[in-house]
């Protein structure tokens, strides 16, 4: 572990410096990492720039995920695109369809003669971004999955010593937390489509969409209005009456409800771990997602969120050599260990995970391995390997609108999810027609 800490400190020190040789070939990466995550990005980029003198990577923050993807598309049309762009997972099908715009990572590595072993990467992470024959299209960067964060002090006050394992227990534990005065509400959530519908589906091994959630064809259709989905969403809506569940908003907007001690549990991205450590004044645990025991005997696997690095065409051969070297650097065991241990994201390589696991890190940081275990403890099924759906950025907006209508009592779960399926399928057909 001392060796790991020593080399991680080297990565940090290198990131404090900037600039390489004046004649270095310039390469550019547009990303969506702000705040502390942006600082970690700059540390890694600084380390790469100081590790060699041939290339200089310039990292440019372009706003949130949607803004970054939109900016890259506009830049490509204007022939002013960066070499690399960070795109969130829901943009995967859209990027794959843009065959004239993307330079597949596996092909770039081969063309530039850069050694590249895909078996190094955690299968549950890279599977989302590969072709049907296992070729990597983009390099996973900030990968996460939804988990349960729980307030240990509140649980102790309520006479509870562990997180709920099932949704049945979520209701029971929440009511006990409220009645004991330990918290105002039981739980809140974030990224609601991702956590309460997409991962809910894979965790229960039920289809979110036909055609293996889009992996097997563009003629996929949504089916997240099944009886199990309706039951789940309606239960959440009903739980609002007793403060068992409280909606705090999209993305991470509900996090303050947990950080301020109002809600005793938070279901959101594992990537928020670092931020919660800074914003909470109590010890909290991290546990796996709950499942409906009335529906399944045990859960399947969750899927990743976050984003991946796509290489865009239009650069020179020498520039792509620099991009390939940068991606090799990004995959370095110590760079990945630094990224994993300093953020809430999972490592993308088996080496970085094993290095961390064999140290005392997980013993000293309880729950930091939950995300990896939750994603990879079982081989994925056709229902749980991920989603590959066109126009999904816009479809996520539809899901947010319909879920918020349900939370507000304007629609039942059956009507709201049915409307979301109908509206979403129209966008799927539009994508299919455009990419036949």
Residue ranges: model-predicted function:
Residues 74, 82-83, 114-154, 185, ...:
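A structural signal for short loop-to-beta-strand junctions that line the ligand-binding cleft
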Residues 43-121, 153-165, 264-265, 275, ...:
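Extracytoplasmic "Venus flytrap"/periplasmic binding protein-like
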Residues 132-141, 146, 171-221, 263:
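Extracytoplasmic/periplasmic solute-binding protein
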Residues 51, 78, 135, 156-158, ...:
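Extracytoplasmic/periplasmic substrate-recognition and gating elements
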Residues 106-121, 206-231, 278-279, 291-301, ...:
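Short, solvent-exposed loop/beta-turn-alpha elements that line the ligand-binding surface or hinge
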Residues 367-423:
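C-terminal capping/gating helix-and-loop segments adjacent to ligand/active sites or protein-protein/ligand interfaces
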Residues 174-176, 217-248:
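Glycine-centered hinge/linker elements that transmit conformational signals in sensory
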Residues 88-145, 165, 198-202, 228, ...:
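Hinge/lid segment of periplasmic solute-binding proteins
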């Amino acid at each position: 572990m001392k060796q790991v800490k020593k080399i991680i400190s080297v990565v940090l020190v290198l990131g404090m410096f900037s600039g390489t040789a004046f004649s270095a070939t310039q390469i550019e990466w547009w990303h969506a990492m702000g705040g502390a995550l942006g600082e970690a990005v700059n540390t890694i980029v600084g380390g790469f720039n100081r590790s060699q003198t041939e290339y200089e990577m310039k990292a440019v923050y372009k706003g949130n995920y949607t803004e970054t993807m939109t900016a890259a598309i506009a830049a490509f049309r204007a022939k002013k695109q960066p070499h690399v762009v960070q795109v969130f997972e829901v943009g995967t099908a859209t990027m794959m369809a843009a065959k004239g715009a993307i330079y597949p990572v596996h092909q770039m590595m081969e063309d530039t003669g850069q050694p590249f072993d895909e078996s190094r990467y955690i299968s549950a992470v890279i599977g989302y971004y590969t072709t049907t024959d296992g070729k990597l299209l983009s390099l996973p960067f900030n990968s996460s999955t939804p988990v349960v964060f729980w307030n240990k002090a509140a649980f102790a006050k309520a006479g509870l010593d562990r997180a709920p394992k099932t949704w049945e227990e979520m209701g029971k534990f929440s009511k006990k937390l409220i009645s004991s005065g330990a918290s105002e509400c039981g739980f809140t959530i974030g990224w609601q489509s991702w956590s309460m519908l997409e991962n809910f589906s894979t965790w229960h091994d039920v289809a979110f969409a036909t055609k293996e959630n889009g992996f097997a064809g563009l003629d996929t259709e949504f089916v997240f209005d099944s009886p199990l989905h309706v039951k789940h969403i309606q239960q959440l809506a009903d739980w609002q009456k007793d403060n068992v569940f409280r909606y705090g908003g999209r993305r991470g907007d509900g996090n303050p409800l947990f950080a301020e001690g109002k809600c005793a549990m938070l279901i959101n991205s594992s990537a928020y771990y670092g931020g919660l450590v800074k914003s909470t004044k109590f010890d909290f645990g991290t546990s796996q997602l709950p499942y409906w025991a009335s529906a399944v005997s045990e859960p399947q696997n969750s899927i990743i969120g976050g984003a991946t690095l796509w290489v865009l065409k239009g650069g020179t051969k020498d520039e792509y050599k620099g991009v390939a070297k940068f991606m090799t650097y990004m995959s370095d065991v110590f760079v990945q260990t630094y990224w994993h241990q300093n953020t809430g994201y999972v490592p993308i390589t088996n080496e970085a995970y094993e290095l961390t696991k064999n140290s005392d890190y997980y013993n000293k940081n309880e729950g930091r391995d939950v995300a990896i275990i939750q994603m990879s403890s079982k081989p994925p099924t056709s229902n749980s390997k991920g989603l590959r759906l066109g126009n999904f950025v816009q479809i996520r907006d539809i899901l947010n609108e319909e879920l918020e209508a349900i939370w507000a009592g304007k629609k039942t779960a059956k009507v709201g999810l049915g409307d979301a399926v109908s509206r979403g399928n129209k966008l799927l057909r539009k994508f299919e027609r455009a990419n036949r």
